[in-house]
Amino acid sequence: MAMRQTPLTCSGHTRPVVDLAFSGITPYGYFLISACKDGKPMLRQGDTGDWIGTFLGHKGAVWGATLNKDATKAATAAADFTAKVWDAVSGDELMTLAHKHIVKTVDFTQDSNYLLTGGQDKLLRIYDLNKPEAEPKEISGHTSGIKKALWCSDDKQILSADDKTVRLWDHATMTEVKSLNFNMSVSSMEYIPEGEILVITYGRSIAFHSAVSLEPIKSFEAPATINSASLHPEKEFLVAGGEDFKLYKYDYNSGEELESYKGHFGPIHCVRFSPDGELYASGSEDGTLRLWQTVVGKTYGLWKCVLPEEDSGELAKPKIGFPETAEEELEEIASENSDSIYSSTPEVKA
């Protein structure tokens, strides 16, 4: 019997979820951060969606959010003309980086020493986080607001996207290496370090390019306008979501559509695979995050393949606020399937 995809629904946000990012895999699992127009980015356990805490301090919509590799720091980009860096264990704000316009995107270097930002003022900024009083380095060249900016090639290069252009920059010389022009607005961009692959979405197209040369690799066409796409870590699958409220799963090698799912009640703004490839997360206009299994029916996280009569139907209650100490934090995130906040029983039934 075919297994039914049952996503885990993560509630808590009150406005559209516009960005999300996973950390790397740490000794305590991996983590997920979400950016929302409610101005309150949230941190969750990545494999279960369990809420850990909310970063409080922005005074406007948060457009971008990211975690460093070991999930000790978070960074957010917001409409209040600031980017903020946070202690992801305590939830404390570490620094506020003032900008001249709305900030849309943030990204840490691999060693977490530098933060890249971009936004409506068309400038890329590089902040030395060990010298918070120092002025950032600035890169100009974009002709419209920057939507996404990412470190690539072991932080030697930078990828950035504005409305209809993707640009590749050399970090050392701060100069443009190459650019790609599109005939419609670029909606998202993802960088895959293994293989140096760049995933770009625009209109109904999902395009793959070399992140080193920007040369095209392949492209797919989706049935609807796509806002975001993500490539599986093993490059087996691609998932994409957009304006028709659906998530599409493709075979990366053949381009064949394998499955499509409808669970959100609004357009999907962001989708990303987890670092282990076992699930992917989606964020929507409906204000929720949903976690989806890559292989439906596999026991993983809160999913357990059970028969209907084995389901107890019990749900746990959520916690509120960051733990008071790092020790409490580690105890919480190390506990299996800690407090759940789901509106329906998270399981896959045979």
Curated annotation (Swiss-Prot):
Record's subcellular location: Cytoplasm; Nucleus
WD repeats: 12-56, 57-96, 98-137, 141-179, 180-212, 221-262, 263-302
UniProt biased composition (Polar residues): 337-350
Location of Phosphotyrosine modifications: 342
Single GO biological process annotation from the record: protein-RNA complex assembly
Record text on subunit structure and interactions: Part of the core SMN complex that contains SMN1, GEMIN2/SIP1, DDX20/GEMIN3, GEMIN4, GEMIN5, GEMIN6, GEMIN7, GEMIN8 and STRAP/UNRIP. Part of the SMN-Sm complex that contains SMN1, GEMIN2/SIP1, DDX20/GEMIN3, GEMIN4, GEMIN5, GEMIN6, GEMIN7, GEMIN8, STRAP/UNRIP and the Sm proteins SNRPB, SNRPD1, SNRPD2, SNRPD3, SNRPE, SNRPF and SNRPG. Interacts directly with GEMIN6 and GEMIN7. Associates with the SMN complex in the cytoplasm but not in the nucleus. Also interacts with CSDE1/UNR and MAWBP. Interacts with PDPK1. Interacts with TRIM48.
Role this protein plays: The SMN complex catalyzes the assembly of small nuclear ribonucleoproteins (snRNPs), the building blocks of the spliceosome, and thereby plays an important role in the splicing of cellular pre-mRNAs. Most spliceosomal snRNPs contain a common set of Sm proteins SNRPB, SNRPD1, SNRPD2, SNRPD3, SNRPE, SNRPF and SNRPG that assemble in a heptameric protein ring on the Sm site of the small nuclear RNA to form the core snRNP (Sm core).
Protein name in the entry: Serine-threonine kinase receptor-associated protein
Organism encoding this protein: Mus musculus (Mouse)
